[in-house]
């Protein structure tokens, strides 16, 4: 079986400081021989300690494991503040990291039915017309 306590080596390359987006950008190489992939949450913690930042300032994505395992490569962004992270990161990545709530919307079928109901009535009195149509 794989040992989950074995050491993991993190290497960063292509390090760029991006002052316009107030972040540091890098490619991360994770060496984990004889061990399963490291979780994104654990990776965020390790990068935060390496770069003296808070865990909620780090965003990790695009992790790909090489064939045969043992080495994973991905991207990491370390923002100067949690506010900058919330401002510039895509919403889906914030949801994945648990920094934003997922917006629950109606099912596709319900949205289409509502759209078609509203299409049958035109003008400003859509709500009144919908009620009148139901009463008939």
UniProtKB/Swiss-Prot annotation:
The keyword Ribonucleoprotein applies. It holds the Pfam family Ribosomal_S24e. One of its GO terms (cellular component) is cytoplasm. Residues 105-136 are annotated as: Disordered. Keywords: Cytoplasm, Methyltransferase, Ribonucleoprotein, Ribosomal protein, Transferase. GO terms for molecular function: methyltransferase activity; structural constituent of ribosome. InterPro entries: eRP_eS24_sf (IPR053709), Ribosomal_eS24 (IPR001976), Ribosomal_eS24_CS (IPR018098), Ribosomal_uL23/eL15/eS24_sf (IPR012678). This is Small ribosomal subunit protein eS24. It comes from Chaetomium thermophilum (strain DSM 1495 / CBS 144.50 / IMI 039719) (Thermochaetoides thermophila).
């Amino acid at each position: 079986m794989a040992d989950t306590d074995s050491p993991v080596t993190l290497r960063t390359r292509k390090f760029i400081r991006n002052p316009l987006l107030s972040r540091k950008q890098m490619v991360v190489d994770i060496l984990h021989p004889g061990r399963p992939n490291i979780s994104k949450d654990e990776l965020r913690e390790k990068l935060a300690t390496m770069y003296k930042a808070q865990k909620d300032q780090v965003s990790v994505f695009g992790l790909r494991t090489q064939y045969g395992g043992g080495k994973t490569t991905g991207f990491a962004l370390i923002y100067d503040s949690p506010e900058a992270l919330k401002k510039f990161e895509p919403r889906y990545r914030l949801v994945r990291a648990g920094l934003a709530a997922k917006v629950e919307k109606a099912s596709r079928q319900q949205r289409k039915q509502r759209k078609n109901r509203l299409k049958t009535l035109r003008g400003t009195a859509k709500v009144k017309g919908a009620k009148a149509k139901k009463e008939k």
